[in-house]
Each structure stands twice: as structure tokens, then as C-alpha cells.
């Protein structure tokens, strides 16, 4: 055995060589015996968990015996304690707080429809897109015979054709051109007063030259079949 470490026997106090003071209630020695085994989850006497499971004979149907299996049959025989007081049913209520059965709903979803989004056949706006930045035309899914090799249908969100929102032209505030609001004529530069304001000019649209129908410029190649 290791001479430095030798485990003490039960009931022998610890060797307090340095004289360290311990708080009241501190175990100054090994326990004389291990604590008694308790089948409860928490230590300490709890009369509600010490009772045996008691049920009339007509309660134990085949379905219940199938659900609980061996543990249920052993509990009925009194071999193991259960957490149920005598005279109370073993099943938990549907609503432990009120004890009432929740209302019937034809939907298998246990959540309310108004709280959660619902997938619909109509177009949905992307909630993360800027709502005022673009005008979107109504977007509907085409029938399958149109989609086939023809149209790419996007998922719910912003459609492919987006129109930029028009930018409002600045309003004139009655100030002379080139002047800053809140200043006088003497404070403004003469060049700014005399310089003309650039008027918007429409971009020149180039139209392709029209070629009258006639003999094409390329030579006619007869079919090869």
C-alpha cells in the first residue's frame, strides 16, 4: 500500500494536522454507514411517493397493460412504489391548469393560424426587401403547359420585372438660382447668379436605318436534303 495515502476506516475522524477550522455541520469523519436506499428521485420522506398504486380491477385494460408493460403490472402488485396517491387516476389531464379539454380543431397543426405564416397560392412579398424601393407587378404562377421549357417561375418573393420608384423632382423654394437659402445677394457669388441652370435634355434616341425589302445581301443557300 502507498504509505503516503491510506484510506481511513469508517467512523474514523479526518486527520486535521494543520488545525484547520471547519464550519458547523461539516462531516469530520467518514460516515459510519451508507444512507439507506430510497427509490424516490429526491432524498427525504415524501408521503405522496410512498404510497402503492391502487386501482380497481376494471381499470387495467389490455391497452393500458400494453402501454405500461411489465412496470405497470409490477406496480399493481405492489413490488415498486409509485408517485400516485390512492384514489386518483393515473392519467394526466389534458390541461393541468384548468382541467378542461382543449377545443376541437380540424387542423393537425397545434398552433393558431393567425400567429404563424400560411403558405398560400397567391404571391407573397419578400419581408426582407425594401417595400418602397420598387414597384412590382402582380406575379402569378403560369399553368404547367406554359412553364414547360418556356417560363422560369420564381419562388414567392419579388418577381423578375421590377420598376424603380420615380424620384420626386426637387421643389423650387423661390430662391434665386445659385443662391443658398438664408443668404443675401451680397453673400452670393456673381458667377453663380449669372450661370444658367442646366435644363434637362432628353437623350437622343437612335433609330436604325430602314432597309426596304428586296434582294438580301447574302446569297441564297439551298437546303441540303
Swiss-Prot record:
Bilayer-crossing regions: 59-75, 174-193
Keywords assigned by UniProt, alphabetized: Cell membrane, Cell projection, Cytoplasm, Membrane, Transmembrane, Transmembrane helix
Primary localization class, coarse: cytoplasm
Cytoplasmic-side positions: 1-58, 194-225
Pfam families per the UniProt record, alphabetical: TCRP1
Record topological domains on the Extracellular side: 76-173
Topological relation to the membrane, as annotated: Multi-pass membrane protein
Disulphide bond pairs: none
GO cellular component, one term: perinuclear region of cytoplasm
Record's subcellular location: Cytoplasm, Perinuclear region; Cell membrane; Cell projection, Axon
Protein purpose: Inhibitor of neuronal axonal outgrowth.
UniProt family annotation: Belongs to the FAM168 family.
Name of this chain's protein: Myelin-associated neurite-outgrowth inhibitor
Gene encoding the protein: fam168b
